[in-house]
Amino acid sequence: MKKTYSMELAGRTLSVDVGRVAAQANGAALMHYGDTVVLSTATASEKPREGIDFFPLSVEFEEKMYSVGKIPGGFNKREGKASENAVLTARVIDRPMRPLFPKDYRNDVTLNNMVMSVDPECRPELLAMLGSAIATSISDIPFCGPCATTQIGMVNGEFVVNPSQADWDNGDLQLTVASTSEKVIMIEAGANEIKEEKMIEAIYKAHEINQTIIAFINNMVAEIGKEKHAYTSCAVPEEMFAAMREIVTPAEMEEAVFTDVKQVREENIRAITEKLEEAFACLLYTSPSPRDRTRSRMPSSA
């Protein structure tokens, strides 16, 4: 089902096309802001990755030469490796979104943002941040969002919301604020000796704008959002943590870790690890794996 949603954002129209492209992705949004166009997709594997104790999230921001009307010249016509800006943009997308996924979720998730057209007045980095949140929110991937991102610049002492590339590069402030409906969850900033009061004012301003974007995303989720899929929980049972605390007390752990000598600290941790492995060795072969438990719904909050 093809649908288009739009809202006014900093004097321009933000438009989101859903259902036009990337139909096989769990969630996809074709973002338009001015003449800048970014395709954001969210995909997840069907099964959790085994043997890991972290959430395998991958974020990509792909800058294409054709988006600015150029074709690579010379013998090699292929695109080069990701630029420093692309890597840093992917990290800024990752930081606010990663904590909003369930802690016991181990399915591989990829957020891909492909820049298709660039308008110097509308930075594609912002569209990628918003597009990733929208694509994930409307998908069936468990996610405790939505979240929204706003960038604030400062030119001649005045705030500029979602500034152009020139104002972003030459202004006195480069502030990126990501928020949920409840609080600010990420701040990244660079400034040219502005007052602390001005910085706080800019953060509050960005957070206020984020609330309008979140309301916009929630409206999309209510209309076209998919039901979040069931997944295999990879959380360690609380009973196991309690048993571990009986074998190694918090005081023992603090004494082992809080030492200035790295070699001593590593030896202490190795000894504690061996002690726990020996205590739980029999359970590894006689008890069912905690990963056999299945969660039917995602948590209600992050």
Outline where the language-model segments fall:
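Hydrophobic alpha-helical segments, chiefly the membrane-spanning helices
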Residues: 296-302
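Conserved small/polar residues in nucleotide/adenosyl-binding loops
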Residues: 285-294
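Short, Gly/Pro- and small/polar-rich lid/capping loops
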Residues: 1-23
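Gly/Ser-rich oxyanion-binding loop with an adjacent helix/lid
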Residues: 107-161
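Glycine-rich, flexible beta-strand/loop modules in the N-terminal catalytic cores of phosphate-handling
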Residues: 25-110, 115-117, 122, 188
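Mobile "lid/hinge" segments at catalytic clefts and subdomain interfaces of large enzymes
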Residues: 142-250
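N-terminal leader/propeptide and maturation segments of large enzyme subunits in energy/redox metabolism
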Residues: 239-284
